[in-house]
A protein has these predicted regions:
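Exported/periplasmic ABC-transporter solute-binding proteins
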Residues: 1-134
Length: 134
């Protein structure tokens, strides 16, 4: 976090903390590291994590905060400099809508995501192992 204060870092892409979870997590981490007030002038508030990723990938900013799952889709354009531990687990819910026109297909997809093969596909993309609600 302290590296964000370096003179070589002019812009930091961050999902707007007012409405993006990633932005709130990042702001809280920077506040905890006592760098938020120093780097706040460098912050470029963006609409979402993918936009922050794009800003870093196309070098519009020198740094940015994204979820590991997003950084994993551009390994040739971005490098993960640090992983920020969170005090609260980040969850990715999956569900079928009540009015689904294809409930059987939706249930099969959910089953696949929860299966060993589905988890094997998701693991390299930084998705945590599926915690099944029983």
């Amino acid at each position: 976090m302290k590296d964000l204060q370096q003179a070589s870092i002019h812009h930091i892409a961050l999902g707007n903390p007012a409405y993006t979870p990633a932005g709130r997590y990042a702001q809280a981490a920077m506040e905890q590291a006592k760098v938020w007030s120093k780097v706040q002038p460098k912050i470029v508030n963006v609409n979402n994590v993918r936009q922050a990723l794009d800003y870093v990938a196309n070098q519009s900013t020198e740094a940015g905060f994204v979820f590991g799952t997003d950084a994993a889709i551009m390994p040739d354009k971005v490098q993960v400099a640090a992983t920020i531990p969170t005090t609260k687990a980040i969850s990715y819910p999956i569900a079928r809508t009540i009015n689904s026109k294809e409930p059987a297909a939706a249930n099969r997809f959910i089953g696949f995501v929860r299966s060993a093969k589905g988890q094997q596909i998701l693991k390299p993309l930084w998705f945590p192992e599926c915690a099944l609600n029983k």
